Amino acid sequence: MSRIDTPAASRMQTIARNPVMIALVMTLALAGCASKKNLPNDAAGLGLGAGAATPGSQQDFTVNVGDRIFFDTDSTSIRADAQATLDRQAQWLAKYPNYGITIEGHADERGTREYNLALGARRAAATRDYLVSRGVPGNRMRTISYGKEKPVAVCDDISCWSQNRRAVTVLGGAGS
């Protein structure tokens, strides 16, 4: 076996013969892989990386509060899980009073266009009414219905339909 005589090869041979150097290199390599960045709002655990939500932003509202609620088939009743989300929205809107919102009502693909536009309007209105009951001024909100025109899931089964029966709260509507 021939020996390579270059400065880099010489350094590698020195490191390879020194067990302390091997241990140091391995420790540094493992420590670099195992470190977890210290991010605000426990963003490291949420997979958000360096782009963690800025308080008071649309991203903050969406990620930390929740921007949508879901409805049962052919219903405008606010479910218990939706009430919890809307309560958080009302608290957030009280904390950031400069924002107005638009509440978008949606429906699944079943039914006529006209029926689903009306259903989406009733869902948006029910959402608005709930927020008003929690202290959000009505003049900070507007509603719109998209009916079945803007599905988030497109397929022909109940799992898709349930995702499309929703009301979405978007910052920047009335009053902002």
UniProtKB/Swiss-Prot annotation:
The primary location reported for this protein is membrane
- Keyword Chaperone annotated: no
Question: What start-end ranges are recorded for coiled-coil regions in this protein?
Answer: none
Record's bilayer topology term? Lipid-anchor
What are the record keywords, sorted? Answer: Cell cycle, Cell division, Cell outer membrane, Lipoprotein, Membrane, Palmitate, Signal
Its GO CC terms are: cell outer membrane
Lipidated positions per record (S-diacylglycerol cysteine): 33
Query: N-palmitoyl cysteine: lipidated where?
Result: 33
Residue span(s) of domain OmpA-like: 58-175
Signal peptide residues on this chain, from the entry's feature table: 1-32
Q: Which GO terms describe its biological process?
A: cell division
Subcellular compartments:
Cell outer membrane
Cited function: Part of the Tol-Pal system, which plays a role in outer membrane invagination during cell division and is important for maintaining outer membrane integrity.
Which protein family is named in the record? Belongs to the Pal lipoprotein family.
Assembly and interactions?
The Tol-Pal system is composed of five core proteins: the inner membrane proteins TolA, TolQ and TolR, the periplasmic protein TolB and the outer membrane protein Pal. They form a network linking the inner and outer membranes and the peptidoglycan layer.
Name of the protein described by the UniProt record: Peptidoglycan-associated lipoprotein
Q: Which organism is it from?
A: Rhizobium meliloti (strain 1021) (Ensifer meliloti)
Organism ancestry: Bacteria, Pseudomonadati, Pseudomonadota, Alphaproteobacteria, Hyphomicrobiales
Quote the gene name from the UniProt entry. pal
